[in-house]
Amino acid sequence: MNEVWLVILPLIAGYLLDLAFGDPRTIPHPVVGFGNMISWAERHFNCGRFRKWKGAVVALSFPLFAGMAGWGITVGTLAVGDWCFCIVASVFVFYGLANHSLIREGREVVDILKKQGVEAGRRRLSWIVGRDTSELSPKGIYTAVLETMAENLSDGVVAPLFYYALGGFPAMMAYKMVNTLDSMIGYKDERYRQFGCMAARLDDVLNYIPARLTALFMALVANRPGLFRFIFRYCHQHASPNSGFPESAMAGILDCRFGGAHVYHGLLVEKPYIGDNDREISYADFRIAVRVNHMVTLLTVVSIVAVYLCVFIK
């Protein structure tokens, strides 16, 4: 089989599996294993002296381990046969994508908000965001869901696909390890400030290009004149060097306002506003965000396939 198809077929199959099923909640998932490894390291090494150095070793060695494990699986399955590799690689691409699950989690929050009220919506939202949700209004809940969908469209969809395009599923898994490290220890509170410093910076570096690609693709699928100007105006109104790009794109598409003051892990964080239309947000906005996420995911997959076919097929 042509090597190009060893990249394209698992990509398409993994995308279709994610589109149909999303992350299975009852089957072992690599990211759960990554999380267990990180929890073990945090318990044993985030103490005493040299926390910053110990955290740096963890942040660099764990992604290397994930990538090497993926490389070993690649070599082993290719030794069996191309179709064996394609099947296994498809499963890892499926595990590496989070679009279906991201939308499912967001829909569960807004559905519970509509059917069971604000308190239930706050509780369900707390499962997927780091901010304190105990005093959020319905508008605040919708805003948090939309911000999360925009940010994770980059972190959970475009970035994994970007690294798959560069290095196959081993690179995709290495990136997922970095992203999991950042989500678990990449905080600025007293507990993680030193230990998680390298993880947070590495995640910022690896998401630099994907975040900007995400905003570009969001602007393309939205087909809204003036959206690029809106993105450039607000993309740096965020503590993260990357999250402002997809969030400003989503705020521009919806003509709404993100940001403001929120409590994270006991600390009040004042976020600059992204957008200036402080309007009410509704379920209709969530449906638009879902459509944008699906279209950006498809556009990313199609772009990778097109590049491989144009560059490597002679």
Which role fits each region the language model picked out?
Residues 1-173, 186-314:
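Hydrophobic alpha-helical transmembrane segments
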Residues 176:
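Pseudouridine synthase
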Residues 179:
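Substrate/ligand-engaging "lid" and interaction regions
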Residues 183:
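Glycine-rich phosphate/dinucleotide-binding loop and adjoining beta-alpha-beta core of small-molecule
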